From Swiss-Prot:
One of its GO terms (molecular function) is imidazoleglycerol-phosphate dehydratase activity. It is found in: Cytoplasm. This is Imidazoleglycerol-phosphate dehydratase. SUPFAM superfamilies: Ribosomal protein S5 domain 2-like. The keyword Metal-binding does not apply. Belongs to the imidazoleglycerol-phosphate dehydratase family.
Amino acid sequence: MRSAAIKRKTKETDIEVSVNLDGTGVVEIATGIGFFDHMLDLLARHSRIDMTVKAVGDLHIDFHHTTEDVGIALGQAVKQALGDMAGITRYASIHMPMDETLTRVVIDVSGRPMLVFRTAFSRDKIGEFDTELVREWFNAFAMNAGITLHVETLYGENAHHIAESCFKGLARALRAALAIDPRNKGEVPSTKGQLGG
């Protein structure tokens, strides 16, 4: 079973996460940020990754530290659960619609972290959640998971729909890229014989 648990504690946040990459999307999320919990719930359910996230942060200041640190911890958990990445499909490309919005998410589980994020929001906040934090979370996740991740919203108007299409797109891309390809016969999908360098 490809699973991992991470604890991260700083002066700003106290976070515990766990993932099972071969799960069914069983999810337990509690960050204290309603909209963010909703996005993480979508991520788990549509990726089919079993996911637990418990976070206590300095929400009296703002949501930045909690959002970013959850991205760091989840990224670290996914990377740890992947191990040497033997047998994975590695690549995936998804177009994710959400009503009037369409977002493209392309992923390479390469061990080389990179984020290209081309998404503009129609307003600064979704409820109390700053829309700029969507990029902050994706960056923290990609850097710590060690994945190359391209997220581009091709068009869209509603800020909630734009964010949701990004998270659902990532979920479906992870579901495809992390899947074990039986044709790989347990080999690392790289001509180098290893990923991450």
